[in-house]
Every structure is written in C-alpha cells, then in structure tokens.
C-alpha cells in the first residue's frame, strides 16, 4: 500500500531484512522478484517490510531480491539441464546468506519449493 503524503510504501511479506525469506508452497519466486522490481517505481520513499525495520528499498536487496534470484536462476538452470531435485539442491550454494535469521530452518525448504516451481514452469 502506497501512502504518498507520508512517502511510505507498506511492502509486507514482499520485503525481508536480516532474515531469510520463507518460500511457501503455492508461492512463486519468479513473481516475487517481479513484484520486488515493481516497487522501484515508488522511488525514494520508505518501505515498511513484513519483517525488519522500515528503510529504503536498497536495504532489502540482499536478503530479498538477491536471494530469490539465486534460487530462481539456479533451479531453472538445473531443471533445464535435467538435474534431479536432490542434486540441484545439493549444488546450490546459499552460504552467503547463512548469517540471516531463519537460514538453518528455511534454506533447504526454500530450495525445494524453488525447484518444484522451476519444474512446473518447464511444462508451461
């Protein structure tokens, strides 16, 4: 929700700071990335995330967009090359995000959902 007079955009669970995003069953990593990119249209405003402190959009780039792009690109390439899910998950290097809260709980699950999404997209 954009509140122009306050120069604020409420981003909710599209934006994460300091913690790993939770990719959930039925979610869509590709659409999430596009939605994040669409937030750039609001320019120099303050964004209120679902998790973390309000900040400029650039503050959410690493823990949200960069992470989701890594998941999406790695899994899409793996599916395209015929790599099975376990091998794709094993070869995914998420270590640069390991200091984010929830990493131990979510990294594997997120990779699994991202692979399944990429696999489903390959049939479209």
Where are these regions (language model features)?
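Catalytic core of the metallo-beta-lactamase
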Residues: 1-34
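Divalent-metal (often Zn2+) His-rich catalytic cores of metallo-beta-lactamase-fold enzymes
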Residues: 8, 30-83, 87, 91
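Aromatic side chains
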Residues: 10, 16, 67, 97, ...
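C-terminal regulatory/interaction regions
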Residues: 80-124
């Amino acid at each position: 929700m954009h509140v122009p007079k306050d120069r604020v955009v409420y981003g909710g669970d599209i934006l994460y700071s300091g913690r790993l995003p939770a990719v959930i069953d039925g979610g869509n990593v590709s659409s999430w990335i596009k939605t994040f990119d669409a937030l750039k249209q609001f320019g120099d405003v303050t964004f209120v995330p679902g998790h973390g402190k309000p900040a400029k959009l650039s503050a959410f780039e690493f823990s949200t967009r960069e992470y989701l792009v890594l998941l999406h690109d790695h899994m899409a390439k793996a599916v395209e090359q015929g790599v099975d899910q376990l091998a794709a998950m094993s070869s995914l290097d998420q270590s640069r995000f390991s200091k984010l809260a929830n990493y131990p709980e979510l990294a594997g699950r997120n990779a699994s959902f991202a692979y399944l999404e990429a696999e489903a997209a390959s049939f479209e």
